[in-house]
Amino acid sequence: MRKNIVAGNWKMNKTLQEGIALAKELNEALANEKPNCDVIICTPFIHLASVTPLVDAAKIGVGAENCADKASGAYTGEVSAEMVASTGAKYVILGHSERRAYYGETVAILEEKVKLALANGLTPIFCIGEVLEEREANKQNEVVAAQMESVFSLSAEDFSKIILAYEPVWAIGTGKTASPEQAQEIHAFIRSIVADKYGKEIADNTSILYGGSCKPSNAKELFSNPDVDGGLIGGAALKVSDFKGIIDAFNA
């Protein structure tokens, strides 16, 4: 059965001390609650080893925002999936639009990253989505289907371990949001191509998150769609009251 998930993506924010404080604050905010969704925080690498033991693992999962496409070796500045896993982190965001746009991550590179993450026991949160020009040209389905090739090389067993996140790139950090109807339409399309590849059962069990200016004021409406299983949250994840407001959308 697929899960409802609210995952925070801190991006390149928070010093070590600030990150520890934010994680502690979130942990305290959820201390006496039982959220109706899985809660995940994905942090910069420097926070992982400190934050993971601080939070209640029964309520908050911890993940990285990226990992290398190589297992180990002379790759200065890179952090491997094995290293991420050694901190106790359980998740890793892969294929975020910022990584694709600014760091040239391709279908082939992401295919390697996904395989290494899975081999080291990490759950990939695999991101897909179109830019404004592609949306205006009505090419969003074509773009998303091409991006999914990075994970469609996986066995059915491995694919069933990943989480998908649809992010309309034109809505990230812009204040624009896909309408609930737009979100449902493309989430349903994504689920349909998963079903075509792996069958209806795996498709029905795959969590597909929405990532694009999701906030407490619109989360409930977005999450009420049958194919929207939660959110990948950027800016709102840096403020506990906002992040908890989104988590609470599943309690309303």
From Swiss-Prot:
One of its GO terms (cellular component) is cytosol. The active site is at H96 (electrophile), E167 (proton acceptor). Substrate binds at N9, W10, K11, G173, S213, G234, G235. GO terms for molecular function: triose-phosphate isomerase activity. Pathway: Carbohydrate biosynthesis; gluconeogenesis; Carbohydrate degradation; glycolysis; D-glyceraldehyde 3-phosphate from glycerone phosphate: step 1/1. One of its GO terms (biological process) is glyceraldehyde-3-phosphate biosynthetic process. Keywords: Cytoplasm, Gluconeogenesis, Glycolysis, Isomerase. It catalyses: D-glyceraldehyde 3-phosphate = dihydroxyacetone phosphate. InterPro entries: Aldolase_TIM, TIM_sf, TrioseP_Isoase_bac/euk, Triosephosphate_isomerase, Triosephosphate_isomerase_AS. Its EC number is 5.3.1.1. It comes from the Bacteria. It is found in: Cytoplasm. The keyword Isomerase applies. SUPFAM superfamilies: Triosephosphate isomerase (TIM). Its main location: cytoplasm. Pfam families: TIM (PF00121). It is an enzyme of class 5 (isomerase). Homodimer. Belongs to the triosephosphate isomerase family. NCBIfam families: tim. Involved in the gluconeogenesis. Catalyzes stereospecifically the conversion of dihydroxyacetone phosphate (DHAP) to D-glyceraldehyde-3-phosphate (G3P). This is Triosephosphate isomerase. It comes from Bacteroides thetaiotaomicron (strain ATCC 29148 / DSM 2079 / JCM 5827 / CCUG 10774 / NCTC 10582 / VPI-5482 / E50). The lineage of its organism: Bacteria, Pseudomonadati, Bacteroidota, Bacteroidia, Bacteroidales.
